[in-house]
Amino acid sequence: MHKIILVDDDRTNTTLISRLLEMDGFEVVACPDMERARLAAGNGADAFIIDCNLAHGDDGIELLKSIRNGMTEADPDIPVIMTSGDDSRGGNAEMAGATRFLVKPYSPGTLSTQLSELLEGG
């Protein structure tokens, strides 16, 4: 079972996405902010899903940069899917090292398919 760290400050989104991914066989650790995501990374993960816009001034792209720069306990090459309701954030996410970028709202099946492709190689 692949372990996914889901970083999103919207509790409704987090609950829905977690349940749907769990139904598809993923283990999901939901984190509402960057600090909790960094702590969760220390317990191992196979991929991250990070919202670009988090509460309290947190920026998901900054979390992505810290992962890629080895400033967390996560593997710097771990797959990271960035999400945002603002499609203009995609370029910044890509430049920061996002593996994929999804514009909200997206279908749950799309997210599960993207994760499977990244983790299973196809």
Segments predicted by a language model, with ranges:
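C-terminal output helix
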Residues: Y106-L115
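Hydrophobic/aromatic residues positioned on beta-strands within the core alpha/beta folds
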Residues: I81-T83
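Short amphipathic alpha-helix used as the core "switch/output" element in two-component signaling
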Residues: D59-D75
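Two-component/phosphorelay signaling modules centered on CheY-like receiver
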Residues: R11-V29
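Acidic, metal-coordinating helix/loop segments flanking the phosphotransfer/catalytic sites
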Residues: A30-A47, A55
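Short acidic/polar segment at the start of the alpha1 helix of CheY-like receiver
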Residues: D10-T14, H56, R89
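Alpha4 helix (beta4-alpha4-beta5 surface) of REC/receiver domains from two-component response regulators
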Residues: E62, G85-V103
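His-Asp phosphorelay/catalytic-motif detector in bacterial-type signaling
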Residues: D46, T72-P79
